[in-house]
Every structure is written in C-alpha cells, then in structure tokens.
C-alpha cells in the first residue's frame, strides 16, 4: 500500500520540504508516502470560489491513483486522535488499496469531491497554513505506523 498526499498549492519553502521529507524517509518501504502537488487555480477576474474549487477538483481527480481510498482533509471533517489513525492503518493495509489524503486549495475542497470521499478528516480545529498541514500529516502517519509497530517514537 502506498500513501499519497495530494496538495493543492505552490512549491513550499525549504523548511516545509525539509520537515516533510524527514517523516517520509522514516516510513517503511511498504508504506511509502508520495506527495503530488497540484497547481492552484487563479481566482482573478471575478472568478467565484465555486468555479475555482470545481477546476481544482478536476485536477485532483486526474492525479488520484486509480481505486485509492480517498481521505479529504476538511475543517468540518471528523476529529480523529492519533490512536484512531493508528487503528485505521492496519485495516487500510489489509484491504490493499492505496490511500490518498487530499489537501485543498485556499478556498477548500469542492463539495462534490468531499461527498465522494471515503473519509472526511479534520487535522486541527485551528486554521493552519497548507504547507504546515503537509508536515503535520506526514508526522501523524509516521506516528500512527510507529504505534502499530510498538516503536518507541510514540510515548503515550
């Protein structure tokens, strides 16, 4: 199984990339994390947020791995603890499908994409920069894996 992070946004600053890379390189080969950056749509010329999100949805759908479980990150999603993520991970591995976590653009994710998602997940109740979400998600995936392996990284 492979974990994909599809993120609408521009190239991130070096410190974000460095933090993200730190956690992705710690993951075992059977749970590699792959980042797919999706170029955001411009919101210019009176273009509505709805049309921007719809255009970004098309780009996201084109980048989604075929048959992948879709986990959409959204401020109105379910609030999972790290332990809940760790409990979900083995089940996802057993069903054999890749998992794609989607981080929307500045206006969020298109409602059609959210309705199609297998899971709507909230990373935080706080508003976070999208680059920071990449790092936090990668860290939480590593932490969840470490819990399933009784690795000393996670100390509860």
Curated annotation (Swiss-Prot):
Entry's Gene Ontology cellular component terms: cytoplasm
Residues at which S-adenosyl-L-methionine binds: 73, 104, 123-128
Catalytic EC class: transferase
CDD domains hit by this protein: RlmH-like
Keywords in alphabetical order: Cytoplasm, Methyltransferase, rRNA processing, S-adenosyl-L-methionine, Transferase
GO molecular function, one term: rRNA (pseudouridine-N3-)-methyltransferase activity
Reactions it catalyzes: pseudouridine(1915) in 23S rRNA + S-adenosyl-L-methionine = N(3)-methylpseudouridine(1915) in 23S rRNA + S-adenosyl-L-homocysteine + H(+)
InterPro entries linked to this entry: Alpha/beta_knot_MTases (IPR029028), RlmH-like (IPR003742), tRNA_m1G_MTases_N (IPR029026)
Entry-linked Gene3D superfamilies: 3.40.1280.10
SUPFAM superfamilies for the chain: alpha/beta knot (SSF75217)
E.C. number: 2.1.1.177
Compartments in which it is found: Cytoplasm
Family: Belongs to the RNA methyltransferase RlmH family.
Subunit note: Homodimer.
PANTHER family documented for this protein: METHYLTRANSFERASE, RIBOSOMAL RNA LARGE SUBUNIT METHYLTRANSFERASE H
Function: Specifically methylates the pseudouridine at position 1915 (m3Psi1915) in 23S rRNA.
Protein's name according to its UniProt entry: Ribosomal RNA large subunit methyltransferase H
Organism (species): Burkholderia lata (strain ATCC 17760 / DSM 23089 / LMG 22485 / NCIMB 9086 / R18194 / 383)
Gene: rlmH
């Amino acid at each position: 199984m492979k974990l994909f992070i599809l993120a609408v946004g521009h190239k991130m600053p070096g410190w974000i990339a460095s933090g993200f890379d730190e956690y992705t390189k710690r993951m075992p080969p059977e749970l590699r994390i792959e980042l797919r950056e999706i170029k955001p749509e411009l919101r210019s010329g009176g273009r509505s947020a709805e049309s921007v999100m719809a255009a970004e949805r098309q780009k996201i759908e084109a980048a989604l791995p075929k048959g992948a479980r879709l986990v959409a990150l959204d401020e109105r999603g379910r609030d999972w603890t790290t332990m809940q993520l760790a409990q979900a991970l083995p089940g996802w591995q057993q069903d054999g499908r890749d998992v794609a976590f989607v981080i929307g653009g500045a206006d969020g994710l298109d409602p059609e994409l959210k309705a199609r998602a297998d899971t709507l997940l909230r990373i935080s109740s706080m508003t976070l920069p999208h680059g920071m979400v990449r790092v936090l998600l990668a860290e939480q995936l590593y932490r969840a894996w470490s819990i399933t392996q009784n690795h000393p990284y996670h100390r509860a």
